Amino acid sequence: VAMILSYAKDITRAYGGNVVRDCVITVPTFATQLEREALLVAAELADMRVLSLIEANTAAALQFGLDRKYEETKVILFYNAGSEAVQASLVEYSTFPDKGGGKNKTVGQFEVKGKGWKKGAGGFAIDLALTELLADGFNKKWNAKKQKGDVRTIPRAMAKIRAAAKKTKEVLSANEKIPVGIPSLHDDIDFSMTLTRPELEKAAAEVLDVATQPIIDALDAANMTVDDIDGVEIIGGGVRVPRVQAVLREFLTERRTNKSDVPELSVHLNGDEAVALGAALHGANV
């Protein structure tokens, strides 16, 4: 981790022209106290001064509220489908009067009311499900020509399959089907098969089945229901999978009392940059 932070510092120096040592580091909601302390030690080894740690969804919520001021209290659900986990946060935005300088004005503020998460339910889990599907497909072709074997025991071949699985997921997020081809995958055998979006969704069914659990946990922690949610903001690479968004819509519709007033899944934020931008904003105000 210290080496990664050192590399990030080198990139900053190369592009910014100055040595940057002060930083704000984002952590997942489920990071333990020991893990956070270890991260601080890693930053010290990288010769960086940590101004603050901030949870990823909180950083995104900060970035979201930068250009918004709600006259009435609003509750926004932040759904973050990353690589390793899914995190959900219920954030309440409001205003308070500020009479500083003799002027009456209102200032925006937010408070995280509830959080939930599910490890092993992110985009990487879908990659693994597709990897298993492709491995099974190759085994059928391989075993039809050779003696019984399992490509999963061949590290080099599996590395190729994992790379193909990731690309397949990305393409099927925008297309209904894709021809997958891996030349000379193993034992001089070329591998090819066509995968469809429904096949991806079936392979990743176990992952998709728990996609909404973090929302349930966040609602329970905040003592709220879906009826209390005024808006939904989705971030993270995992939300690009169409079925993930479909599952979220189905969940919100099913649990909403007024079916004609179900909040849309919004993408006001850049899902890849929002957390980093929010952390930078926090650092500028520490």
Please tell me what each predicted stretch does:
Residues 3, 12-286:
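Oxyanion-binding/catalytic loops of NTP- or PPi-dependent enzymes
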